[in-house]
Amino acid sequence: MTIGKGTDVALCLHGFGRSAEDFTLFETILEPNQSIIAINLLAHGNSTFPSSRISRNPLSKEEWFYLIEAFVNFLGIEQFHLVGYSMGGRMAMVLAELMPERLKSLILIAPDGLKVNWVYRFVSETKLGRILYRSIIDSPNWILRMVDMLRFLRVLHPKIQRFVHVQLETKSKRQLVYDAWLIHRQLFPRLALLARKIEEHHIPFELIFGTYDRVIPARDGKRLLKHFKQEHRPTLLNLGHRLLHPTTVEHLSETGMWMPSAKP
């Protein structure tokens, strides 16, 4: 979807289980010369991926690069700002690694991909994990009871408990977890290379987390920031994981990090 009519473009990538429409929130701070192009990630909205490839031949980094390159070339966009939230943050980091020369700025909002969760690795990369998860698609009660027991034993934070219940509450959501995890399982950034590309190309960069986010906590940001030669500090907002929020919009507007006009 496109918001605005300006030639200065922000390409925006949403989070897991969400949609491109989430970025309508930023319409309030668009200047006349600016526009937002928000796309639905694969398996989300009206974006599809061949079902025959999900288990055996997932999306590769090269395919992701060529898809976006062809897309922006078709639209006649030479350079663009890149904004990624949660899962979209992981996809944005891969793009920044592969095509830094085309970025005007990079904003990562609670990005996935700073570390690989062992559950994700087990389900997406092992045959046993896939078989086990496919059984959960039809019969999720046992895994939900296990999550509740871990919460009762205080092993699991209540926000993580709620997050799991929300993600697995319907069969369509459980299928989306399986499809999205497997389709994108090869798309993880190389953090040291990403930091070097950002610095070499002088890309204005901001990393934003929610103070109360238990899904992707701010401490994960150290895994990326330690690779920069110059010191970078993450921005902490008084929010949880739902960071596509008016507070974030206000912060980016006030600090000038929303679609900055030029690289320093």
Each language-model region and where it sits:
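Conserved HGGG/HGGXW glycine-rich cap/lid loop of the alpha/beta-hydrolase fold
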Residues: 2-50
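Active-site loop/oxyanion-hole signature of alpha/beta-hydrolase fold enzymes
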Residues: 38-83
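Flexible "cap/lid" loop of the alpha/beta hydrolase fold
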Residues: 97, 106-137
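Conserved alpha/beta-hydrolase catalytic His-Asp/Glu region
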Residues: 139-199
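Short alpha-helix in the alpha/beta-hydrolase fold that links the catalytic acid
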Residues: 193-195, 203, 217-226
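Short beta-strand/loop motif that positions the catalytic acidic residue
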Residues: 201, 207-209, 213
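Catalytic histidine-centered segment of alpha/beta-hydrolase-like enzymes
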Residues: 215, 236-250
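Post-His helix in hydrolase/transferase enzymes
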Residues: 220, 244-258
